[in-house]
Amino acid sequence: MNENLFASFTTPTMMGLPIVILIIMFPSILFPSPNRLINNRLVSLQQWLVQLTSKQMLAIHNHKGQTWALMLMSLILFIGSTNLLGLLPHSFTPTTQLSMNLGMAIPLWAGTVITGFRHKTKASLAHFLPQGTPVPLIPMLVVIETISLFIQPMALAVRLTANITAGHLLMHLIGGAALALMNISTSIALITFTILILLTILEFAVALIQAYVFTLLVSLYLHDNT
């Protein structure tokens, strides 16, 4: 019997209980807190990447926005490491679950919106009505801007889910095609396998890029509200 194409996206269970919580906690092991005075190469590389990313993320923020630095860095490290671990064979990628991505996107989006209404109430309300709007269009524009505001967390979650899921499905299909072609034509199977390797390299880049894009959009939402 052929394996279900979406079997790899099913939440794994142990004795009937989902173990996704353990899987989500696993990436934290990859970033240990060093106890030595002199860091090794891996820790130094991690610190350099964090400093480089934090400079790019926080350059546009004022002092109030920079208080979110730890949250943003933790977010990009968590999503990036989770996406990369999901590329390992026979592994599970939590970021292919829309429910989990919504669980990250909605609280972060709500936090930025609440921050804006608490500290910049007039400016936040002004976003619902662009300056110079004709009076007859005011009700319609308010409704449109309200809908666009509430669509933001959904767009965050769907973008991450769709990109990660599409890559995994494509790798699954090309890998299955390479195995099927081995009995038909070895040369075509080798070409297909080469395409699979190139796609895998591309998926490594996509995993990191999607983590950066997700965090960058949260950072931009925060910038608009601080």
Swiss-Prot record:
Disulfide bonds: none annotated. Subunit a, of the mitochondrial membrane ATP synthase complex (F(1)F(0) ATP synthase or Complex V) that produces ATP from ADP in the presence of a proton gradient across the membrane which is generated by electron transport complexes of the respiratory chain. ATP synthase complex consist of a soluble F(1) head domain - the catalytic core - and a membrane F(1) domain - the membrane proton channel. These two domains are linked by a central stalk rotating inside the F(1) region and a stationary peripheral stalk. Its main location: mitochondrion. This is ATP synthase F(0) complex subunit a. The chain crosses the membrane at residues 12-32, 68-88, 97-117, 138-158, 164-184, 200-222. It comes from the Eukaryota. Belongs to the ATPase A chain family.
